[in-house]
Amino acid sequence: MRPLRIAHLTATFPPYPGGAGNTCYRFARGQAERGHHVEVFTATATGEAPDPGDAIVHRIDPVMAIGNAPLIPKLARLDSFDVVHLHYPFIFGSELTLLGRLRRRTRRAALVVHYKNRLMGKGPRGVMFETYEHTVAPALIRAADRILVLSPDHARSVSYLNRALEQTPDRLIEMPNGVDTDVFSPGADGSGLRERLGIPEDAVAAAFVATLDRAHHFKRVDVAIEALARTRNRDIHLIVAGGGELLDGFRSEAVAAGIGGRVHFLDRVPHGELPDVLRASDLFVLTTEPPESFGIVLIEAMACGLPAVATDYPGVRAVLDAETGFLVPPGDSAAVAEALDRLDDMGADGRARIGAAGRSKALRQWAWPALLDRMDEAYAEAIEARNAKLGAAA
């Protein structure tokens, strides 16, 4: 494939710890290493950002921002690119991208929409999100030359994606999240971290990784805490890696449940240090609910050889199966507790057997080189489709 000029549009980007931004970072850096000209357009952020390699990152002061929704007018005027790659959800970014398609120079670029998850919320925020999902999101999907979905299972659970799947199936391409299987791999034990946290050598430690802020309310660490309080085996501990304004409230919940000594909050952990946390653990738990659509931390844990307990709903169940862990109903702390007890009861050898199956699956399905190859193919299809549209309109 000839080198392309690629513009990535993303609401968040490292150092913000969200999965969508980290996925954008990995694709952008990997594409630049392959010789493409890559530019990332995102909002300014605080903190130390990882090296983007040869990718150019434009951190632009937004005119305004509502949470993780920055208004950056420049996004409507991106000329001279072969591909505009929008990472959804991106409130304001989606509208500006659609506005840009009205400009002759901008609409020459193929539009690729990388769909991560629906917008969902409660109260007035939920009403706004629902309106957005019935107006802007479907319009964006109709305009896209190619739509990248995390799994067909998840796409069928979203009405406008399911409609696109039925009407124009060639426009949808499965593009799961990826994991660096060299960085996230089984390794030396994390006895140092366990000792520092006061976790006994013969105890079983479950890892939970999430940003603990209001934007990630659906991660449901409260379900994991309640499940730990209900376990039959009292030697199970929970290591929570993640910071945010909700952390203190969750710490209070653990104390109120009488398990403050078995729940260990690390606050925010840099992404590069997550492998150490996972290697210090015996298993992984993901009690998230919609709109979570995949769970990057889940495949990172599996790549480290950990068996997992995860919520059974579209997207996540495309990742975890009976050979690699246990699926439980959303919000069911009793089912989570039972799964934790079963993993504890089977001992280290049983957990290692399940973890090895997860590691094997990560190597087969989510390693970055194969995903970068697939992205090149998706871009080629999008460019061909865009050229056909331009030719028909001439």
Tell what function each PLM region has:
Residues 110-112, 119-143, 156-164:
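Nucleotide-sugar donor phosphate/pyrophosphate-binding loop at the beta->alpha transition
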Residues 138-174, 179-186:
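A short, active-site helix/loop in glycosyltransferases that binds the activated sugar's phosphate group
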Residues 141, 268-269, 276-281:
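Short alpha-helical donor nucleotide-sugar binding micro-motif in glycosyltransferases
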Residues 185-199:
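A short helix/loop element that forms part of the nucleotide-sugar donor recognition site in Leloir-type
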Residues 200-219, 225-228:
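Conserved donor-binding/catalytic core segment of Leloir-type glycosyltransferases
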Residues 251-269:
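Nucleotide-activated donor-binding/catalytic signature segment of Leloir-type glycosyltransferases, i.e.
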Residues 307-310:
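Short hydrophobic beta-strand element within catalytic cores of glycosyltransferases
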Residues 321-322, 326-334, 342-348:
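Conserved acidic donor-binding segment of nucleotide-sugar-dependent glycosyltransferases
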